[in-house]
């Protein structure tokens, strides 16, 4: 007997989801009673689902058995043929085969098929310049102020200082090229598969909205080490999303420390997280936080699975 398991490597959530088991009987006798046990495992939380198939195979023939692949949530699923029992004609005795084969498949966000649009106009209108106290060669003088400890003495305006008998500092304005960082972190050990699914849907909607505006995005998620991708096209995003879904959940990190390291290098930072985050009074950082109850605080948007689609439609980045 020859047995093959075939599943697509990539499926879209709630889309077509058929896989197949091919069984070929090479013997001169029919197999009237064959039992197959299949097990699915969600790689994020190791939740399992089992199913039993009963069928028959005529002599020198092949059976193509359709199996329905679970696609309710985004993520990576493993499907395994755990056991095969081939019974005799009277279903009294059987030959058993165990752990025959295993395949994995990725379930992509439904946003790949829908036209979700997020208003990202705010990203181009805010923070077009970077005020830098240590700037030496600024593009132009933005303002003047009294000298404070730490100001660059090369920016002293000597003519005004001599007139006013006080040190006057030129505040320089330095153009900064737009740089967008999208940060994804699944931190809580108790995070549900529903939260993870909603976060991936949001990630897909945010990045695809940026790509439609022909913006380049740096995408970062944390495991034991930082994983960073530069995304220019939907194909590149699909590749990094596939990598993300095949990884273990992130280690718990200090979000505040991470933001202090990164915020000065990017004009805009979008953080998609599943844990409570500190308040960051900075215009260029936006947190999209997932939880069990809805609410909002300052620059944080708190999503739940129930309000996700409404919140995405109202989100202004």
Summary of predicted features, one role per range:
Residues 178, 194-197, 232-239, 253-257:
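Generic alpha-helical secondary structure signal
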Residues 1-229:
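An amphipathic, basic-hydrophobic helix/alpha-beta surface used to engage anionic
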Residues 38, 146, 182, 239-243, ...:
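Charged/polar, solvent-exposed surface patches and flexible loops
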Residues 25, 148, 163, 190, ...:
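Disordered, low-complexity tails and leader-like regions
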Residues 223-244:
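Short beta-strand-loop
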């Amino acid at each position: 007997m020859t047995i093959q398991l075939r599943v697509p490597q990539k499926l879209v959530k709630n889309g077509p989801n058929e896989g197949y088991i091919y069984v070929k009987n090479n013997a001169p006798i029919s197999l009237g009673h064959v039992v197959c046990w299949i097990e699915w495992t969600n790689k994020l939380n190791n939740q399992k689902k089992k199913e039993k198939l009963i069928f028959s195979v005529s002599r020198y023939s092949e059976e193509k058995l359709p199996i329905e692949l679970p696609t309710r949530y985004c993520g990576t699923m493993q499907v395994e043929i755990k056991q095969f029992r081939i019974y005799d004609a009277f279903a009294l005795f059987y030959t058993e085969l165990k752990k025959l084969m295993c395949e994995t498949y990725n379930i992509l966000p439904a946003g790949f098929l829908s036209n979700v649009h997020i208003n990202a106009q705010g990203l181009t209108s805010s923070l077009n310049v970077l005020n830098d106290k240590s700037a030496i060669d600024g593009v132009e003088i933005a303002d003047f102020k009294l000298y404070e400890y730490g100001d660059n003495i090369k920016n002293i305006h000597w003519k005004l200082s001599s007139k006013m008998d006080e040190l006057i500092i030129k505040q320089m304005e330095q153009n900064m090229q737009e740089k967008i960082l999208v940060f994804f972190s699944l931190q809580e050990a108790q995070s549900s598969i529903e939260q993870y699914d909603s976060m991936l849907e949001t990630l897909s909607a945010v990045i695809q909205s940026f790509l439609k505006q022909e913006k380049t995005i740096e995408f970062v998620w944390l495991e034991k080490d930082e994983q960073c991708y530069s995304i220019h096209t939907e194909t590149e995003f699909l590749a990094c999303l596939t990598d993300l879904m095949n990884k273990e959940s992130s280690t718990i990190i200090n979000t505040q420390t991470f933001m202090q390291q990164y915020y000065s290098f990017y004009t805009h930072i979008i953080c998609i997280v599943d844990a409570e985050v500190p308040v960051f009074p900075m215009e260029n950082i936006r947190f999209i936080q997932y939880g069990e109850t809805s609410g909002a605080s300052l620059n944080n948007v708190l999503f739940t699975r129930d309000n996700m689609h409404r919140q995405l439609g109202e989100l202004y980045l």
